[in-house]
Swiss-Prot record:
It is found in: Cytoplasm. This is Co-chaperonin GroES 1. It comes from Vibrio vulnificus (strain YJ016). InterPro entries: Chaperonin_GroES (IPR020818), Chaperonin_GroES_sf (IPR037124), Chaprnonin_Cpn10_CS (IPR018369), GroES-like_sf (IPR011032). The lineage of its organism: Bacteria, Pseudomonadati, Pseudomonadota, Gammaproteobacteria, Vibrionales. PROSITE patterns: CHAPERONINS_CPN10.
Amino acid sequence: MNIRPLHDRVIVERQEVESKSAGGIVLTGSAAEKSTRGVVLAVGKGRILENGTVQPLDVKVGDTVIFAESYGTKTEKIDGKEVLIMSENDIMAIVD
């Protein structure tokens, strides 16, 4: 399935985190945190400004990002993979 986000939306695949504590204990259930890092799979054309012009997004396909899961973040399954659909505003940083 092909999916194309609209406007300032971004599709991110969450990166897995290490499920062990610093002491080597394997964490499960609620003790294992979900990662707030992911790889950008697709981006919309940009944010529409009040004057009608389109401001391109800062993030690009392939960027590794750190994001905040907010009320507007949507989780979907696409081709068997769980992806997040979020606004670029929910992305806090690009990891180089």
